[in-house]
Regions:
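Catalytic cysteine-centered active loop of the rhodanese-like fold, especially the PTP/DSP P-loop
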Residues: 132-183
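Active-site neighborhoods of enzymes that stabilize oxyanions during catalysis
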Residues: 187-197
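Positively charged, proline/Ser/Thr-rich regional signature most characteristic
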Residues: 70-153, 194
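Flexible, polar/low-complexity N-terminal or interdomain linker segments that lie immediately upstream
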Residues: 19-96, 105, 197
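Bacterial N-terminal signal peptides
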Residues: 6-16
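Short, solvent-exposed loop/turn and secondary-structure capping segments
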Residues: 108-111, 158-161, 187-188
Length: 197
């Protein structure tokens, strides 16, 4: 009888503690991925603390509009809007992720492996993503890139995308992560401090 009592106590008190360790997956089949950054490999996981809450910087629901207006789901014809799982798959394939936010936002925290090209500079820095400068940009060898900013209410990456398109970047080579940092952080995904560019 004593053994049954001990076993029952273990099931009710110890098993939940064991189950909590590593119980927050990205999907039911994926716990983490590792991406290469300039500082070495970084593991992308979700926060394993079931009581964690979103970063207070992204908890606000109402920001003055303009400038913080809700952005359209489709930022431009031909540009594909993606969610978190598509971002992770893009990362796994070594895709180039662009943090289109200002440097001040970028250094506070960014998606690991992302490159900071602020929306105010992107039109003059297309050479960093496969275009060649001439009388006009030649983007025939442009890389497929994924851009993000702060989230649904942030216009920095949509502004960057429109600037890229205006300069001749092919829409089919641009992915737009509309949920941005707010969506990334709401899922407890890994964030690192950005570097000054």
């Amino acid at each position: 009888m004593k053994n049954v009592l001990i076993l029952t106590l273990m099931v009710f008190f110890v098993a939940p503690l064991v189950a909590q360790a590593g119980n927050v997956g990205i999907t039911k089949d994926l716990m983490s991925i590792t991406v290469q950054t300039e500082k070495g490999p970084i593991k992308i996981i979700r926060n394993q603390d079931n009581k964690a809450v979103i970063n207070p910087g992204f908890a606000k629901t109402s920001r003055k509009c303009p400038p913080f207006c809700v952005q359209p789901h489709t930022v431009a014809p031909g540009v594909q809007t993606v969610g978190e799982l598509e971002v992770i798959k893009f990362m796994e394939k070594g895709g180039l992720i662009i943090d289109a936010r200002t440097v001040e936002w970028h250094v506070k925290g960014t998606i690991p492996g992302s490159k900071s090209i602020p929306y105010t500079q992107i039109a003059s820095r297309l050479n960093e993503i496969g275009c060649k400068k001439g009388a006009k940009w030649d983007c025939s060898n442009a890389k497929t890139v994924l851009l993000f900013c702060n989230g649904l209410w942030c216009g920095q990456s949509p502004t960057a995308i429109r600037a890229m398109l205006r300069e001749g970047y092919p829409a089919s080579k641009i992915l737009y992560y509309r949920n941005g940092m707010q969506g990334w952080q709401s899922l407890g995904l890994t964030v690192i401090e950005g570097e000054m560019s």
